[in-house]
Design a protein with these regions (language model features):
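Short alpha-helical transmembrane segments in multi-pass integral membrane proteins
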Residues: 1-22, 80-145, 189-244
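Residue-level signal for short hydrophobic patches within transmembrane helices
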Residues: 15-34, 38, 61-68, 144, ...
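Hydrophobic/aromatic residues in alpha-helical transmembrane segments
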Residues: 23, 39, 76, 117-118, ...
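Helix-loop interface residues and adjacent transmembrane-helix termini in multi-pass membrane transporters
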Residues: 37, 46-49, 83-86, 161-162, ...
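Small-residue-rich hydrophobic transmembrane alpha-helices
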Residues: 52-112, 149-168
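Hydrophobic transmembrane alpha-helices of multi-pass small-molecule transporters
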Residues: 64-67, 111, 179-184, 209-213
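Alpha-helical transmembrane segments of multi-pass membrane transporters/permeases
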Residues: 103, 158-182, 199-202
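Residue-level detector of conserved catalytic or cofactor/ligand-binding positions
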Residues: 251-253, 257-259
Length: 259
């Protein structure tokens, strides 16, 4: 499989390669948007307008946390692609392992403050006594699960960049379809309201993460996890962050945009 991917990148026409890699990426981005759309539909119908207002309050916090996932995921995906193009597979695997460790560290460093000052942040975003409880119910479940979000989306980008765009797309589809199935079960059937929507999201992210992580331990993957690659190396971390900082900054700008 690895040799086939390398051959395609070296010999196929640029236009065909662009289509091969771009279309699954576009579909994956649309699928990503489904998480928010589906949650809004079911929460609006099953819980009510105050819950919808509470859900809207959560977006700046969630976008902030997702920006750090973008910082690592986009940077790692690009670096892996560069090293594979140079036939430096060992360096590509170092990037993979360092990105995994870095995701854990940065997630912990951002999630803990968000949990501690959650109510203060929601008040700053214009929350009221009526809407903040809904926002807290959602965030108390979703924020601790940020690690799953960062791993699933970030390493999905690495999977795509390393030559598996269709597999990356199907992995995202699995998560989105699971979310669509579980939302009505938890919100309506189990009568868990906005908490049910949060649980459905986390379960779908867990499933997506398991599929992505499983890919990088398979023998047919062009880059794989190895014990020696998880130890952080300054130059590897620097290489990841210098590329990831641009999409990270753009993600932060989105938070300040009026909705």
């Amino acid at each position: 499989m690895a040799n086939e991917i390398t051959w395609r990148l070296e010999h196929e026409k640029i236009g065909r390669l662009l289509l091969h890699y771009a279309m699954p990426a576009v579909i994956g981005t649309m699928v990503n948007a489904l998480y928010n759309i589906v949650d809004r539909i079911f929460i609006g119908q099953g819980v009510g307008p105050l819950a919808m207002a509470g859900l809207t309050l959560t977006f700046p916090i969630l976008l902030f946390l997702q920006a750090f996932g973008m910082l690592i995921g986009a940077g790692a995906a690009t670096r892996v692609s560069i090293y594979l193009g140079r036939r430096e597979n060992e360096m590509a695997e170092k990037v993979l392992g360092n990105a995994f460790t870095l995701t854990f560290i940065i997630t912990l460093a951002t999630v803990v403050p968000c949990m501690i000052w959650m109510k203060d942040l929601l008040l700053a975003f214009g929350g009221s006594e009526q809407t903040i409880p809904y926002a807290q119910d959602y965030l108390n479940i979703v924020v601790p699960g940020t690690l799953l979000t960062s791993l699933s989306f970030g390493f999905n980008a690495v999977m795509r960049a390393s030559g598996y765009p269709k597999k990356a797309m199907f992995t995202m589809l699995i998560g989105a379809i699971t979310n669509v199935i579980l939302d009505p079960i938890f919100i309506f059937w189990l009568d868990m309201g906005i908490k049910g929507a949060a649980i459905a999201t986390i379960i779908s992210m867990l499933l997506c993460t398991l599929f992505v992580m499983n890919h990088f331990v398979q023998k047919d993957s062009i880059v794989r996890f190895h014990k020696g690659t998880f130890k952080l190396e300054k130059h590897v971390v620097w290489n990841i962050l210098t590329i990831g900082v641009s999409p990270f900054a753009l993600s932060l700008i989105r938070i300040s945009e009026p909705t």
